[in-house]
Amino acid sequence: MTNIRKTHPLMKIMNSSFIDLPAPSNISSWWNFGSLLGACLAIQIITGLFLAMHYTADTATAFSSVTHICRDVNQGWIIRYLHANGASMFFLCLFLHVGRGMYYGSFSLSETWNIGIILLFTVMATAFMGYVLPWGQMSFWGATVITNLLSAIPYIGTDLVEWIWGGFSVDKATLTRFFAFHFILPFIISALVLVHLLFLHETGSNNPLGTSSESDKIPFHPYYTIKDLLGLMFLLLTLTILVLFSPDLLGDPDNYMPANPLSTPPHIKPEWYFLFAYAILRSIPNKLGGVLALIMSILILAIIPILQTAKQRSMMFRPLSQIMFWILTADLFTLTWIGGQPVEHPFVTIGQVASILYFSLILIIMPTVSLIENKMLKW
């Protein structure tokens, strides 16, 4: 008798994707983050759904409805903090996932990589709109500052901003539409994830050596299902510790004050996962230039495959490229720190140097270093 998982129309799709999928035998724990991102997305959708049952998208009641969730709803506080800190875990896994792709040359799977970049933009948009919903001080002013950046677009900028706001300022119409988009986008993300996996399974996974895995494959289950479960346990442990011991560690105290259009917070800053891009935006004095640099800080990922000059796919045996990669990582940490600092000396200068270094490393230094390594291979 044939196995039902191999014959049933629905189950055979699951079977060929998660059970009998031929996977490289040597992929390390850096390949765990795909499944962890799937787990994060599931946590966000489930907790978000329960929060939406009690939240009201109205400027008069949004802040108090979030307070009501935390105080009066059964286990509401844990649902709220799982959702808020779940977003941080989501971005942590995302950054590590992208870093893995850069280090091991996974960007050469161009369709998968490009869908991944679209996913990154979509997740960032979703997180930004979610941050506006509690309608605290940082929610309101964050929404005002970031949406206002679109006014830098020539000719249509001002009209575009007012169209997004639904009026002449961030108000009830803005909050309502942000809630609608924040609710629908995770489902669009889920669809994009399926496309991401579809393209990945067309080519098969990369591996740490960057070589072809065709000659040495093992079934995904039980080997990598068990490995992914271990990663999931670490993720849930970290998230649980964060939620139960210091749920407000990554938040902003200003967001515990209801939104007040007449009082500007001393330092307007987004959540920690946007700070690197925010620092790049602030380091350019020109508004349009800053917006372009902000977009390019993420979109630059799309041109990494074009800039690949190395003979070897992975950085595993390229020590000079490894050094440049870790300098880039340190630079991103620096940008994240600068994004959270006030706009004054010496932070402005450090931000400008770090921004120049960020683009220089990706566009010029790393491709040049790869060419040097190619020459060294011939010695």
From Swiss-Prot:
Its GO biological process annotations read:
mitochondrial electron transport, ubiquinol to cytochrome c
User: What is its membrane topology?
Assistant: Multi-pass membrane protein
Please verify whether the record's keywords include Cytoplasm.
no
Q: Which residues bind a ubiquinone?
A: 201
Where located?
A: Mitochondrion inner membrane
Q: Does the keyword Transmembrane apply?
A: yes
| UniProt keyword list | Electron transport, Heme, Iron, Membrane, Metal-binding, Mitochondrion, Mitochondrion inner membrane, Respiratory chain, Transmembrane, Transmembrane helix, Transport, Ubiquinone
Q: Which SUPFAM superfamilies match?
A: a domain/subunit of cytochrome bc1 complex (Ubiquinol-cytochrome c reductase), Transmembrane di-heme cytochromes
Binding residues for heme b b566: 97, 196
- The residues that the entry says bind heme b b562 are 83, 182
What is noted besides the main data? Heme 1 (or BL or b562) is low-potential and absorbs at about 562 nm, and heme 2 (or BH or b566) is high-potential and absorbs at about 566 nm.
Q: Which family does it belong to?
A: Belongs to the cytochrome b family.
Question: What is the name listed in the Swiss-Prot or TrEMBL entry for this protein?
Answer: Cytochrome b
Supply the source organism for this entry: Microcebus berthae (Berthe's mouse lemur)
Organism ancestry = Eukaryota, Metazoa, Chordata, Craniata, Vertebrata
